[in-house]
């Protein structure tokens, strides 16, 4: 997603709505009784109309200026950003992958995936690697023991990705001092870890109340929880289990690859994994009947995960959660990369979609 386009839209919208418009109205009111009131009124109308036109054009360019990924199998459609309300999150491209024979095997299950720009086309991603979702999905769609399915790829919020994907209720259970510390943490010299207040509840609500109804109404899909799944990696893994457990009546399962259990990049004295586990323990006790897939490697960023995933596994093992509904896989020697996730993508998809 082009953050410059998104930010431009918001700057124009908010500047126009609160400052730009009110500023001209104040000027106008102050000279309303003057000799030139009619001329000023006409000028103001022209300026406001121009602002509205700029807003409309800029909204459209969120979609138009973002290159469409190329796929080697199936076909890809980009949703019209103006067809969705986007009342809860910033507009961004959303791509829908369809099997080559769509809609012959309708109704289809739906996999909602995060980090949509990284899913299909390595030439479009920031690091020139991709999940190669189209290739794996096309192969699985040919198997009789797998539900036919489509994939909805939601592009992320760029600099605000961490704020959008960090599970909100666990975050809010941290002490005020720890929350403040996280908001002050720098990801790099120029970028904060959390670019804005954590808003993953809004993101999850967007998927459930804005995006899913649109997909259900415009594509030949099954709409029940047994055919609705969510999936992501790293921070996308966190938001996947969180969304599925917040909406267990909507999602039948979540796949969480290389789940970023630390929540930040601190290795010592980090309370975040503990609040995640406390949240999970409460949800597990509710027996939500949701499939949960976890995996991890042991190289690069994944080297942080083995002991943390082990604690999560113990929660499930100690509970009476249906053992057929969750599984964890360890991939020795694998790193925190799209190519590693692409290699094993068939495993979580099979777990979720097995007939």
Regions found by a protein language model. Give the residues of each.
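Non-catalytic cap/lid and distal C-terminal segments of serine-dependent acyl enzymes
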Residues: 65-355
